[in-house]
Amino acid sequence: MIKVGILSDTHITKITEQFRKNCASAFDGCDAIIHAGDLTDISILSTFTGKDIYGVCGNMCNQATRQLLPETKIIYLNGYSIGICHGTGPRHNIEERLLRLLPGTDCIVYGHTHTPICHNTGNTLFINPGSFQGTGNYGAPGTYGVLHIEKDSLKGSIHELVRKT
């Protein structure tokens, strides 16, 4: 089995101790990490040393990050195709647009909307991990996804970060 941690919309320009702690807690035991964009700065990915890292840029990424990361990417893990794209435009019909952009993929991972989602449409598993940073003053905790890839199945789940006390 392959366990993949999924996050998006971190919107930070430097790694904080709290970010490190959240990542260590959320992605313990993960073999790989997918960041679905709006990491803002490429240095954020250095948090995940020792893991395979797959990322795309988002609309809030700085210029250097946009030059280093693609807008879309397809990876293959354990025989499954996983399309990664931050997403653009309005929330309405975003998954239809992603299906046209990444046709035939077994799983599509995206961000942009800050709304955690994990469901199947036809033969495609959609995962949007929501915003890893949460919504601050609005009180919603950060969220992330986990993808379990076995020989004969893909299963995703959404989780909330433990709130700071």
Residue ranges of model-derived segments:
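Active-site neighborhood of phospho(di)ester-bond hydrolases with catalytic His/Asp-centered motifs
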Residues: 6-8, 32-38, 54-59, 84-86, ...
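Helix-adjacent hinge/juxtasegments
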Residues: 54-93, 104
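Short, conserved loop/helix-junction motifs that constitute active-site signature segments
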Residues: 28, 47-50, 77, 100-103, ...
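Short, solvent-exposed aromatic-acidic interface loops
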Residues: 156-165
